[in-house]
């Protein structure tokens, strides 16, 4: 089970976007990376296709999972632990003790 999943609200711990938060769009577990909405935005040169025109577009690049932390209810970063509730393994916020999974 992964500590950070698609749809989670996360906070960036280090790098140029330190302190900013966003929602996880995609997780790449084999590379230990995630794409976060509005974080690590880079400019990409795009070639013209039948559906899209050529130009420079802004796109989110991936961030290493070690630089991300799940945001607690108050928006501050928290570590993630695991607990068994009703025979089901769930994620738990270490800071507040609340269950992250519904």
Curated annotation (Swiss-Prot):
Transmembrane segments: none annotated. Keywords: Ribonucleoprotein, Ribosomal protein, RNA-binding, rRNA-binding. Pfam families: KOW (PF00467), ribosomal_L24 (PF17136). Disulfide bonds: none annotated. GO terms for biological process: translation. One of two assembly initiator proteins, it binds directly to the 5'-end of the 23S rRNA, where it nucleates assembly of the 50S subunit. Belongs to the universal ribosomal protein uL24 family. GO terms for cellular component: ribonucleoprotein complex; ribosome. It comes from the Bacteria. Gene3D superfamilies: 2.30.30.30. The gene is rplX. SUPFAM superfamilies: Translation proteins SH3-like domain. GO terms for molecular function: rRNA binding; structural constituent of ribosome. InterPro entries: KOW, Rib_uL2_dom2, Ribosomal_uL24, Ribosomal_uL24_CS, Ribosomal_uL24_KOW, Translation_prot_SH3-like_sf. PROSITE patterns: RIBOSOMAL_L24. Part of the 50S ribosomal subunit. This is Large ribosomal subunit protein uL24. NCBIfam families: rplX_bact.
